[in-house]
């Protein structure tokens, strides 16, 4: 009887070791890649409850968060009174509870969410004060007048336009058509956001 029991014990130990190893691999080795995946909606849900930093053009927000009275706490909004969100959509991208993030929302996501190591001291300060961590503002080199001119120039055509400062190489404008409104993708209504994403995919296809 001892040999079969010993065999079972060894098999059980090996299975436990494999299970522990795979769990450890996910927790410690792949954790960063999983957390930084723009399609990781669990991370998106966590960050939606934060005051995400704005994306600025010449000091004016073209993407910003407003407090709302729902489970997500903050609603991401795009454009302003004088800046058409469609003209900047190819730059800002979207930040969605359904489809993750794209554009600058993705590229500068760690700064906007407040997760960047560069914001370490801000995070420490928030920890001791008990305040909710806030994201940093990200300012683009875009000139709103040049951007509007590029957007207007494209009109109803399908295409893209980029303007650079010849001295510095800074991007002054980057527009593409057909345009789309990222506000629909940022909706907290999952049905509305999903429909907007399907429409965007259809337009790209």
Regions picked out by a protein language model, each given a short descriptive name:
Residues 1-160, 174-205:
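Extracytoplasmic/periplasmic proteins that interact with beta-lactams or build/remodel peptidoglycan
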């Amino acid at each position: 009887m001892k040999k079969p029991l010993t065999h079972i014990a060894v098999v059980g130990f090996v299975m436990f070791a494999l299970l522990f190893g795979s769990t450890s691999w996910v927790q410690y080795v792949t954790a960063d890649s999983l957390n930084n995946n723009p399609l990781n909606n669990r991370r998106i849900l966590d960050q939606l409850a934060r005051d995400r930093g704005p994306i600025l053009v010449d000091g004016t927000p073209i993407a910003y968060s407003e407090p709302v009275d729902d489970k997500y706490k903050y609603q991401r909004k795009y454009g302003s009174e004088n800046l058409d969100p469609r003209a900047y959509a190819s730059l800002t991208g979207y930040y969605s509870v359904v489809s993750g993030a794209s554009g600058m929302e993705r590229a500068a996501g760690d700064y906007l969410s407040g997760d960047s190591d560069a914001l370490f001291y801000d995070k420490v300060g928030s920890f001791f004060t008990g305040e909710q961590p806030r994201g940093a503002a990200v300012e683009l080199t875009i000139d709103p007048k040049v951007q509007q001119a590029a957007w207007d120039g494209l009109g109803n055509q399908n295409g893209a336009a980029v303007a650079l400062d010849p001295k510095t190489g800074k991007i002054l404008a980057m527009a593409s058509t057909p345009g789309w409104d990222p506000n629909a993708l940022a909706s907290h209504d999952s049905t509305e956001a999903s429909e907007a994403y399907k429409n965007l995919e259809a337009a790209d296809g």
